């Protein structure tokens, strides 16, 4: 991460969820959600089992992909999806 101001309103050490595919298999992050309860999820967009979940800090996510800072303004209950790393993000409200 560069010496830019931290883009999220949450602290850099805020716990968030990712998947083993992003963390251990270097898959790109293609699904991001800012859940109603305040939790962030940064996932590969694939199918997941409970054992695929990993907990990391927001700062760690930015170290994996600094472009995630572009989604720091997602409101509670919003998600963003992309088809690939070169696609535009499509932001929508999550279904309750």
Please report, for each region that a protein language model flagged, where it lies by residue.
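Acidic, proline/glycine-rich low-complexity IDRs
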Residues: 1-96
């Amino acid at each position: 991460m560069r010496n830019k101001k931290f883009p999220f309103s949450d602290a850099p050490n805020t716990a968030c969820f990712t998947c083993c595919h992003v963390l251990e298999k270097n898959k790109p992050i293609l699904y991001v959600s800012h859940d109603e309860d305040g939790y962030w999820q940064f996932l590969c967009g694939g199918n997941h089992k409970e054992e695929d979940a990993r907990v990391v800090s927001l700062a760690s996510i930015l170290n994996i992909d600094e472009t995630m800072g572009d989604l720091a303004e997602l409101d509670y209950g919003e998600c963003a999806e992309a088809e690939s790393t070169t696609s535009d993000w499509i932001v929508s409200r999550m279904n309750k």
